[in-house]
């Protein structure tokens, strides 16, 4: 799948580098960033998009199930952002976007670990946004609802149909619709938007 995406992007004339790394490990994340910078130059735009689930009700949840999700989903924001933030501050420009989740806003049965990690991502966003604004760096969150990703499509079809029935627009989201929101925040015209959380969920959650 990764190779297909790389070929598609390269076909559009974009230079692409893929680097393996464990975003849950600070040393590995730093090495990953250095490898990218050596091949492509400084990182000006960072999308923190790591996400796993280890679903179970809290009274059955093991410490490992909790820690794995928090480490991958939330700690990765620190691990990957820390190596790039100084360069962004020095260059007086940057875009940092966290991909959180509707379940970080409304909670979800059996996902105390996942919901906590995704809610924490926006807490990270609004704090870093305050620290970084004067350096020309915007920091925002995108909180998708149920999108037809590999993770969601692995859910049994009858369950997916029940989920879609709860969405006012009547369907799951498409990955391109989330990418469009990310591209919006990256755009120079969005330079006055920072600390925001953009909900993209087909109307399933309308908190404000």
Question: What kind of region is each of these model predictions?
Answer:
Residues 20-31, 63, 176-177:
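The beta1-alpha1 cofactor-binding region of Rossmann-like NAD(H)/NADP(H)-dependent oxidoreductases
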Residues 57-58, 62-70, 152, 163:
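Substrate-binding pocket helix/loop in short-chain dehydrogenase/reductase
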Residues 81, 117:
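Active-site helix of classical SDR
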Residues 86, 130-131, 191:
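Alpha-helical segment proximal to the catalytic Tyr-Lys
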Residues 101:
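Residue(s) in the substrate-gating loop at a strand-loop-helix junction
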Residues 106-109, 183, 194-208:
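Short C-terminal tail/terminal secondary-structure segment
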Residues 133, 138, 193-195:
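Short, small/polar-rich loop/turn modules that mediate ligand/substrate recognition or access, typified
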